[in-house]
Amino acid sequence: MGAYLSHPKTDKTSTDQFNELLAVGASSMQGWRNSQEDAHNSILNFDNNTSFFAVYDGHGGAEVAQYCADKLPHFLKNLETYKNGQFEVALKEAFLGFDKTLLDPSIVSILKILAGEHNFVDAEADDYEEEDLAELQEESNLPLNEVLEKYKGLPQKKDLDLKSSDHKENFKMRSPYFRGRRAAALAAEATNKAVMDPSAKPDGSSTSAAAAAAALSADGVANSRNPSNVVNPMAGADSNTTTSINDLSTKNAALKDDSVNDQNEGSNGTDFKHTLVSSSNKKLFATGSNDMTELNQSSKNEFTNSSTSKEFERNINSSQDDEFTDDDADYEENDNVKSPDTSSAESSDCTENDDDGDEDGNEDSDEEETDEDQMANDNFCANMIEEPGKDSGCTAVVCLLQGRDLYVANAGDSRCVISRSGQAIEMSIDHKPEDDEEASRIIKAGGRVTLDGRVNGGLNLSRALGDHAYKTNVTLPAEEQMISALPDIKKLIITPEDEFMVLACDGIWNYMSSEEVVEFVRCRLKDNKKLSTICEELFDNCLAPNTMGDGTGCDNMTAVIVQFKKKLQELQSTIPPNQTEDKLLKTSENVSHSLNDQSASKRCASQNADADDEILEKNNSKRLKTDLEQENIKDRTPSPSNQNEDPTQKAIKEVTIIVSSS
């Protein structure tokens, strides 16, 4: 699971649009998550009599979802197959082709800006360790008040010297203990409410998609020359690591009190928190203002150390032993995996029999295999390249409505559902690693699916845009990689019975079924509520009261509701009716009913056969009884051998024969 806030952010970003054919309401809510990683499109006038709707659910950071919302519609529109009206082929080409562009260096640089990595480059762990160990030693001799001043984020002489040398291209974050993945959560939070020129993005794009142009504008050039203008997640973290380990326990209390006071005096009452998460070992999460400027100011004036001194010391000790990073914010791992102690088992085998020894050997073998899988998963995640688009990605469910023809392309576990006279028609399939088709592809590509349904212990979905760390098998095409961007395509002709469709991320579908969502929306449409208001009420209904459960109701939530108007029926349709999802479902149901009938017939035949078998068994029983009686008669006939038999023994024998025959 990802990091959670102490209180959910329930403010929503909502829009309502309409034309003569459609009415659309969309909304998104951050919820309990540390940052908002969803994005969406709602483009009514995408093309002539054509609309485009999409929901992108990001993981490992918001940058890929934001970039998709900003660029994917135009990418699709420029394809020759789209221009030729081959929409099904065009959607597949768009997903696979757009996913490939995420490896382009120029695109990666844009993703880095979205992820908050501008002017930050990775370096080897040894370089960081040498610098920080030296600084730790130096800071251990400083007076306490100077250390506390640095915790407050006040500029010191070293900081001024660093700013004077900011023309160096390879500016590095100085602490290996806070290096983590990158501050994707911070970037998503900072850019969530950015405003972009409407001409630079598709109409109807979600507000989170604005970050690309905003970051590439004036700030992009200025930030490349002045790191002080960049949101630096290390503002308070640097000085935290430079405190002597021996002084941590005595300084932590004073630091905490000072931090709380500073927090209360922060601008606009916003909090800016850096939290060390011990389970992910150097993972950095941030929460605070959505405004980039406020984050810059608060990072200088506010810092709350929410990790205990024990947690901090444990992070330092573990960092000295090894370097380890997770693949995304949704991935949790067990840092204390131990190899099974086989020595005691071997010694005990000497006193047990061979069978017990075999059982112990099997148990040890199972444990070793489990540990080997765990180690392989850990190594995969530890060696994952920390770069946007490689260790981050997004699901995508895209709806292209051309006339009355609806094409739905889906990769991942977001979903699209149509309400036809109150009945839910699912227009997408959730792609999960444990599914037979998905698991087969993952294993063929060299991956593993864990018992909790994760690919190599990381992602809990099997198709997505981005995540190129899982797409490195050079012998296989893109659509056959562990994580594939190939979408499933479903088609439908909109009829007068079709009322609306709902696109939403798994934050909704993990809590409510398709039928429940359809009924929820229908009830509120009868009350003439705005579509965006219905989305907001849907979020409130799904929101968990706390984060103590299994994570259901704690995710980001995004939904788009599209209501079909009567005039839409005047438009033409070109999809062959026998290829639409409703017809395929009906055919599938007929086949299912036929199989059920055959099964019932077999059961009926089986019952008759059982009856015949019962009659046959009774007849056999009668024959057996007759044979036994004849044997009894023979036994009762005196013979020379038993004429002198003892009467008592003879009586016992007769009773035994009678009982056996009955």
UniProtKB/Swiss-Prot annotation:
Q: What is its EC number?
A: 3.1.3.16
> Quick one: which residues bind Mn(2+) 1?
D57, G58
Q: Name one GO biological process term.
A: signal transduction
- Residue ranges annotated as compositionally biased, kind Polar residues, are 238-252, 261-275, 288-319, 337-347, 591-609
Name this protein carries in UniProt: Probable protein phosphatase CG10417
Alphabetic keyword roster: Hydrolase, Magnesium, Manganese, Metal-binding, Phosphoprotein, Protein phosphatase
List the GO terms this entry assigns under cellular component, sorted alphabetically: cytoplasm
Q: Which CDD domains match?
A: PP2Cc
Residues with Phosphoserine modification? S289, S306, S592, S594, S599, S639, S641
Q: Provide the GO MF annotations for this entry.
A: metal ion binding; protein serine/threonine phosphatase activity
- What top-tier enzyme class does this entry carry? hydrolase
* TM stretches of this protein: none
The ranges of region (Disordered) come to 219-275, 288-374, 591-662
